[in-house]
Amino acid sequence: MNESGSIGIIETKYAEFKELPLKNGSVLSPVVIAYETYGTLSPSKNNAILICHALSGDAHAAGYHSESDKKPGWWDDYIGPGKSFDTNQYFIICSNVIGGCKGSSGPLSIHPKTGTPYGSRFPFVSIQDMVKAQKLLVEFLGIDKLFCVAGGSMGGMQALEWSIAYPDSLLNCIVMASTAEHSAMQIAFNEVGRQAILSDPNWNNGLYDENSPRKGLALARMVGHITYLSDDKMREKFGRNPPRGNILTTDFAVGSYLIYQGESFVDRFDANSYIYVTKALDHYSLGKGKELTAALSTATCRFLIVSYSSDWLYPPAQSREIVKSLEAADKRVFYLELQSGEGHDSFLLKNPKQIEILKGFLENQSSP
């Protein structure tokens, strides 16, 4: 554990609710939400910021769970004392999405009627349902209005949904490396990943036991991880270099890297959750053009939209579509395209300019 600039040891907490009506008409009952908080809620409860995670993320956004942890939470560079999301000033909340596998209700949860994991019997959940569950948590914490909702990638979709589903419940919205709907190409990559899982001999219609479809999930992660990088970064890091390990397994260093990414992913993620969450991403759509403008017209908060020059998964053009529609709806929006060679994952990586942009946007709003 490296405590330099960190908020230290953090405990994941759990909130349980009786039920959650879902968009498709079914009801999830009970509902458990795993979450973490950083900083102190002000007496007037007006300094709360909700951080929404991406596909493979979780509630552990900052700090460490134990002194033996080698790495902090996934956005530790941005959350903490004096950082972009300053815990000396703000009360930060991050929760695991429902349908995920990091403590919130999902396919790994025990079905109350069978006493066994839901597996593929878990109901389909949407981005709207994820946000609805977050709203339950925010109300449980006694907060009526959030100072800001922020997220990148899938987290950006959740932030957008917050702005239109609960317009009176947030003052600011930060959307990074995201989109208002998936393109055919983005859906295609997710479909290949899902088919890899479905083709695994251990799939068993999603009702697998400890013999889970690890090979299929590893392949899905390999495909997905390619989209998080950039051509320049891959050329710089790997080129056409040979692997260090078994040359019968792969001929190039980039192949060895992707195999490692896939194999390490299966130890921390669930195949069913991968299917559920990617489907939620693919089905989310606020439309284009006038339809998108109309969808965003109910929002009342300020927006910061950030894109990245080398992001080919959610290219800058998709962020500019959001900005154009927000402007057409006469909303207050700030837009920045950051030059970065890191691809889609740029929003996760430490970047002094990004740190200052986020901090400046929050500080230039009405003080909490």
Curated annotation (Swiss-Prot):
GO terms for cellular component: cytoplasm. Its EC number is 2.3.1.31. Residues 47-349 form the AB hydrolase-1 domain. SUPFAM superfamilies: alpha/beta-Hydrolases. Its main location: cytoplasm. GO terms for molecular function: homoserine O-acetyltransferase activity. GO terms for biological process: homoserine metabolic process; methionine biosynthetic process. The keyword ATP-binding does not apply. It comes from the Bacteria. It catalyses: L-homoserine + acetyl-CoA = O-acetyl-L-homoserine + CoA. Substrate binds at R221, D345. Transfers an acetyl group from acetyl-CoA to L-homoserine, forming acetyl-L-homoserine. Belongs to the AB hydrolase superfamily. MetX family. PANTHER family: HOMOSERINE O-ACETYLTRANSFERASE. Homodimer. This is Homoserine O-acetyltransferase. The gene is metXA.
